[in-house]
């Protein structure tokens, strides 16, 4: 389950950003782009995030995962296509092997929603 390690890396990245803020914001949502070709299970990622953020600066923050489809480009046919995730990734028209992936390998933070905490 590599989602646990990915979640640790995600938290460390957000921690670095958080530590650079002069006034520490309350993080409410983290929007993440996850490509289909990363083989990341969104449910496992959500679970790992919930477990690892309890009693931290991210406690209560929501992880919003946007699935990015796998899109490849066939240089022979000069067209984009969306291969099915599985064993066969060749062009559906000419059967050339997939060698130019246009999207689907993303695993990145799209944006962080937050608001400034008001002093008590």
Swiss-Prot record:
GO terms for molecular function: nickel cation binding; zinc ion binding. Zn(2+) binds at residues 74, 77, 91, 94. Keywords: Metal-binding, Nickel, Zinc. InterPro entries: Hydgase_Ni_incorp_HypA/HybF_CS (IPR020538), HypA/HybF (IPR000688). Gene3D superfamilies: 3.30.2320.80. GO terms for biological process: protein maturation; protein modification process. Disruption phenotype: Disruption of the gene has no effect on hydrogenase activity or urease activity. Ni(2+) binds at residues 2-3, 41. It comes from the Bacteria. PROSITE patterns: HYPA. Involved in the maturation of the nickel-dependent guanidine hydrolase GdmH. Required for nickel insertion into the metal center of GdmH. Seems to be required only for GdmH activation and not for activity. Belongs to the HypA/HybF family. This is Guanidine hydrolase-activating protein A. It comes from Synechocystis sp. (strain ATCC 27184 / PCC 6803 / Kazusa). The lineage of its organism: Bacteria, Bacillati, Cyanobacteriota, Cyanophyceae, Synechococcales. The gene is ghaA.
């Amino acid at each position: 389950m590599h989602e646990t390690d990915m979640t640790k890396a995600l938290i460390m990245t957000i921690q670095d950003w958080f530590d650079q803020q002069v006034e520490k914001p309350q993080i409410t949502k983290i929007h993440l782009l996850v490509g289909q070709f990363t083989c990341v299970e969104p449910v496992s990622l959500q679970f790992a995030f919930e477990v690892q953020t309890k009693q931290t600066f991210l406690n209560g923050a929501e992880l919003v995962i946007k699935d990015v489809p796998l899109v490849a480009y066939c240089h022979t046919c000069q067209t984009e296509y969306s291969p099915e995730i599985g064993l066969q990734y060749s062009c559906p028209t000419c059967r050339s092997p997939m060698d130019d992936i246009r999207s689907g390998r993303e695993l990145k933070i799209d944006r962080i929603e937050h608001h400034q905490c008001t002093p008590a």
